[in-house]
């Protein structure tokens, strides 16, 4: 285990300025991503001064995350996977898969900052959480389909939902388009050969 000082809050580890121990592999990730510094004698001695620097950098990162959130709010994801007749996938969809999808769209989000609360093992509609900053998590919609027809239906479904929400917002519901899409995103999946109602019985936080 290696001792580090967190430069920003990290889920399941602690807040900025906390000294903690992690496995070498995770430490390398945190150091490379500039989320932490080594807990050397010099860094520990200057922890108060380090904390002021950490706070300033954290505010800068939060502003950058807010800008990224604005560009991501209209995004949704579609991934094609082979599946059985009952919609069960041959395999599963992982945070690494989501990171690749986002990378293809021009967004660099590490898979460790992507999480969801159920194992994705069926064709259907899901919510994926993107941790853009420890204080800013953005949920976006993911459609898991098994063919091009399913992808077309997912695009149509998403467009219809957005039009519906836009109309409700115009009528004064008080909820933004993107907020409503996230709230509805797991409740109205369509049942076709391409996109089926999902079976989400497992509730662990999946991080891979």
Curated annotation (Swiss-Prot):
- Residue ranges under compositional bias (Polar residues)? 186-197
Q: Where is this region: Disordered?
A: 161-208
Per UniProt, the keywords (alphabetical) are:
Ribonucleoprotein, Ribosomal protein, RNA-binding, rRNA-binding
**A cellular component annotation (GO) from this entry:** ribonucleoprotein complex
Tell me which Pfam families the record gives.
Ribosomal_L9_C, Ribosomal_L9_N
Listed under GO biological process in this entry are: translation
Against Gene3D superfamilies, the record matches this protein to: Ribosomal protein L9, C-terminal domain, Ribosomal protein L9, N-terminal domain
Would you indicate the residue range of the signal peptide?
Answer: none
Q: Which InterPro entries match?
A: Ribosomal_bL9, Ribosomal_bL9/RNase_H1_N, Ribosomal_bL9_bac/chp, Ribosomal_bL9_C, Ribosomal_bL9_C_sf, Ribosomal_bL9_N, Ribosomal_bL9_N_sf
Question: What Gene Ontology terms describe what this protein does at the molecular function level?
Answer: rRNA binding; structural constituent of ribosome
What this chain does, per the entry, is described as: Binds to the 23S rRNA.
The family note in this entry says: Belongs to the bacterial ribosomal protein bL9 family.
- The protein, known as: Large ribosomal subunit protein bL9
The top of its lineage is: Bacteria, Pseudomonadati, Pseudomonadota, Alphaproteobacteria, Rickettsiales
């Amino acid at each position: 285990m290696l001792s580090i000082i967190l430069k920003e809050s990290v889920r399941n580890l602690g807040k900025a300025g906390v000294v903690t121990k992690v496995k070498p592999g995770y430490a390398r990730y945190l150091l490379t991503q500039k989320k932490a510094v080594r807990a050397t004698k010099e860094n520990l001695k200057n922890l108060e001064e380090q904390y002021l620097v950490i706070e300033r950098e954290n505010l800068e990162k939060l502003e950058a995350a807010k800008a990224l959130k604005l560009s991501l709010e209209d995004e949704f994801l579609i991934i094609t996977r082979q599946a059985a007749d009952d919609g069960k996938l041959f395999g599963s969809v992982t945070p690494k898969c989501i990171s690749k999808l986002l990378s293809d769209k021009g967004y660099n989000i590490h898979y460790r900052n992507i999480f969801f609360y159920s194992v994705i093992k069926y064709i259907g509609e899901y919510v994926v959480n993107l941790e853009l900053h420890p204080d800013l998590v953005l949920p976006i919609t993911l459609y898991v389909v098994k063919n091009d027809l399913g992808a077309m239906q997912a695009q149509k479904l998403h467009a219809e939902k957005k039009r519906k929400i836009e109309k409700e917002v115009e009528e004064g519901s008080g909820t933004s388009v993107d907020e409503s899409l996230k709230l509805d995103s797991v409740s109205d999946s369509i049942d076709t050969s391409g996109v089926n109602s999902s079976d989400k019985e497992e509730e662990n936080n999946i991080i891979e």
